[in-house]
Amino acid sequence: MDWFVERREVSDVLHLRSGTRILPATFERGACVRKGPPSHGEYTWTELSRGTPAPGLLPSEVLERARAPLAESSRLSEGAALREDVVRRLVDVARSAGALHLEVTLREVDRWTLHAQPERMVEDRTRHALLEVKAFHGEAGGPRFDAWRCVTHPDATRLHAALPSLEAWVDTLVRELRETTPAVPCPDEALPVLFPPGAASACFFHEVCGHPLEGDVVARGGSFLARRLGQRVAEPFVHVSDDPTDAQGALGFTWDDEGHAARAVPLLRGGIVTSPMLDARSARALGLEPNGHGRRVDFRHPPLPRMAHTRVEPHEGDLASLLADVGHGLLVQHLTPRHMNLLSGDFSFHIVEARLVRDGRAGPRVGPGVLSGNGLTALAHIDAVGADARNLFATRGCRKLDHGPLPVSFGQPSVRFRELRVRPGT
């Protein structure tokens, strides 16, 4: 038997075409009780709107530890003015740089959990401030183009302290958008593809390496990588891991939602499929120990083996050096998932933002496209990994079954593939 108590507070500031909106803060508290073993236990959850559990829901010693996370007071109210100032100043910068419009989402989240078993109790507290911007450019009556970026900081105070660099970041985004549009058609061919540090690389490795090595998938032999544990699938310099403790202080956690210590799990080590991410249930099924990846969307959901901070380990060089050897290729800056077959490894992604590469230099943007292939072939085609890693947050979270969205993050350097298939999309 165990008990899980959660407190979550969320505050949002948006800037849309209609103006700036400050959304009412959300504040949730609840508890979940598991009776029976993790492999087939019964979970019962209760929302605690008033912060005080009904008599008998929690043992007295658990209730005493839960008083702090269940307290009524807001933990985000002191950052309200800072969040509004960040949004206002970035909108002003985008306007000065010539953007048609800048959409901004600034969300700060504070989460406090307590996991208790008869033999021990552990607490974990996380906070992050997520900034997402989308710049628009185009002439009146003509086509419009956009570019999206995001960044995460541990809280609104440190986000606000980084305003000078954030203003430069938005200014660069808008100017690059203006200089690289209008777009040319996406190629229809197999060609070298590069991912700069950021969204495209994060999306690719999350789908192609992460989900196939979640413990429940591995336990049922349900993925192309699960069937290849211990086998080489990429070059020796390709290392991919998932480490909940490493997220630049923004999204990391010390204990998972089952009370197990979070730790780094090597998914690919030296190009070899190495380890799955495990919760208690999948670990038991595989005859292994949990490794700190049992995560809940919230107190209403039981834990599942999930990714946290998926990273490609840095190797050597940077984007410029990886580009230098490419005569004709595609620099893909932003992907979104389209299709992923865990059994076969076949995948396809929407190309949201990309630029043609000619003679080692990034050129004009291309129109919408589709990147497709097979996971084993794509991993084998990685011929360079840079040392220029950057952290990124999945702004829409990660969904699995009916459990989502769950906050996840990434650490990604530049990555080059000898060849991937691309074609125009819609």
Where on the chain are the PLM-derived regions?
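N-terminal small-residue-enriched
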Residues: 1-426
